[in-house]
Regions:
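Charge-dense, helix-prone N-terminal extensions
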Residues: 1-116
Length: 116
């Protein structure tokens, strides 16, 4: 990583841990973020099923299909969680839009945190 480049894991960690009642622990060998210590809302995917760096997150109904159709270079249907509508977001693309990722993570958090 060159000077000035953002470490994707560290930036994602900052975004997730800034939200209320969020904790981090390893799940299936990957950093994963939980709401109130129980429900996963984001999991890091460091070359989990392919050669890509990404994260998987909860998403509002219909968001996965719309985002993957609109930009398959940046978004995908993740294994395991994709069937539940979760969204995969590639972090190894040029010019990662961290403001957009903050919004995606906030939406993921809301999907899980609002379920009590």
């Amino acid at each position: 990583m060159s000077i000035g480049e953002v470490d994707p894991l560290e930036r994602l960690r900052q975004i997730c841990l800034a939200l209320p009642e969020v904790t981090e622990r390893l799940s299936h060998g990957e950093p994963t973020w939980f709401v109130r210590g129980k429900k996963t809302f984001v999991t890091y995917a460091d070359h989990h099923h392919d050669e890509r760096l990404a994260f998987w997150c909860a998403a509002p109904a219909g968001a996965q299909a719309a985002m993957v159709a609109a930009d398959p270079e940046r978004f995908f249907r993740p294994p395991y969680y994709g069937v539940r509508g979760w969204l995969g977001v590639y972090l190894d693309v040029p010019n990662v839009d961290w403001a957009e990722i903050e919004d995606i993570v906030a939406d993921a958090y809301a999907q899980i945190a609002n379920k009590r």
